[in-house]
């Protein structure tokens, strides 16, 4: 990997190198490794996550070296730079008609793709459900047995270019029409109720104790989160600004399915 990384880093600093075969071959090799799940834009290292910046750079530089192509699928015509992912059956992936995954995204066995979209560089681990009209953005990292409900938007790193990908850890449940963008990290087995919107600047307020505890960019493991608001002063007066409220936790003493059901009932969370 060191030689690949060196080539990618050099091309990132000097885009003229994108005209050289050595560079384009290296970029395409990185994309192939991502597609196979052998290389990731971010990965767990111990109890932390490491962002592989050079891998993300390769994804960004893959676009300008690709040529536009036109192809047909039945009555539909497409004109794009990116190929689509193939080989779902032998990998044990269920793909419902109108689901789209780009080549360069890794999708593990046991994943179900309802009519949804998975962008290049993304990593979707085994047993995860990507429900109808959900979007998994470029380089986003989705763990095992995650449920991305209908209309969920998981942001990517390309448009605009972001420092870190969104990370959704194992067992998390992301409710309908949630938005998670700008490198937000959702911990294991967390539950986001419907319409929670998390950006890098969104206040996430734990209201389970005697005093509120504020954080940004990270939802702790097993947290149950709902949309909320807080009062902010502006020149024109005081107005409500959206935030997210941690109102409880999933209990680790029960299995995941029971814990999720109990959490939804106990806290009256819409999903």
Language-model features: where?
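Structural signal for interior beta-strand "rungs" in well-ordered beta-sheet cores
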Residues: 93-233
